[in-house]
């Protein structure tokens, strides 16, 4: 897939850069593999905003993507087509197992309609195949990696991302993350070979505020332009600097302050991410 630029017949088209999705499926998704999706607007069960700058956007149906890849061990599946998924930046692939079962998986790079994928204990090292990390050769690029065996892939699921298997030690696999972090995961955890599709997503330019609204992203308002009741940086006559180190609306330090709290998993991190 390539990038598309546009002739500037309107101001927003001058900057707009989009991914060319002309090769993807143009019809509707498989109805049995989708379900309704209600947007939360960033509100929790009490109706309070817990995630700011969310809401609105185009209505979506949720595609049930198989992140576990343990449904049909050692049964080959043929890629029927590649599809767009509005719920993620990566493309998804519709696969049909030899017994006729349909499923969606994350599409890796270089996967195309007609290819065969399989998941199991020991399978070929080719894009789209899934197997435990203990059986994958060191140096291999992988994505959709589990943190706990059987839980389903959690690492490297966004467009263009991948991890590199750099070693194995005492039943654990050592993985290099996109951030530069080096961490270990149990060898029984499944991973899929290859990098995630749609690497051009990194070069997309939205072009106008309205396109962000279509995606469900609301405006981000700086605290320094608010009133004192709304933000610690608010108030003052004319333009002010805020008068203190940057904080969130709730007074917690931000912009570079370390926020990692989970000490229980520190033992799985060999080297922290690059600063």
Curated annotation (Swiss-Prot):
One of its GO terms (cellular component) is large ribosomal subunit. It comes from Rhodospirillum centenum (strain ATCC 51521 / SW). InterPro entries: NA-bd_OB-fold, Rib_uL2_dom2, Ribosomal_uL2, Ribosomal_uL2_bac/org-type, Ribosomal_uL2_C, Ribosomal_uL2_CS, Ribosomal_uL2_dom3, Ribosomal_uL2_RNA-bd_dom. Belongs to the universal ribosomal protein uL2 family. Keywords: Ribonucleoprotein, Ribosomal protein, RNA-binding, rRNA-binding. Part of the 50S ribosomal subunit. Forms a bridge to the 30S subunit in the 70S ribosome. PANTHER family: LARGE RIBOSOMAL SUBUNIT PROTEIN UL2M, RIBOSOMAL PROTEIN L2. One of its GO terms (molecular function) is rRNA binding. Residues 36-55, 224-263 are annotated as: Disordered. One of the primary rRNA binding proteins. Required for association of the 30S and 50S subunits to form the 70S ribosome, for tRNA binding and peptide bond formation. It has been suggested to have peptidyltransferase activity; this is somewhat controversial. Makes several contacts with the 16S rRNA in the 70S ribosome. This is Large ribosomal subunit protein uL2. GO terms for biological process: cytoplasmic translation.
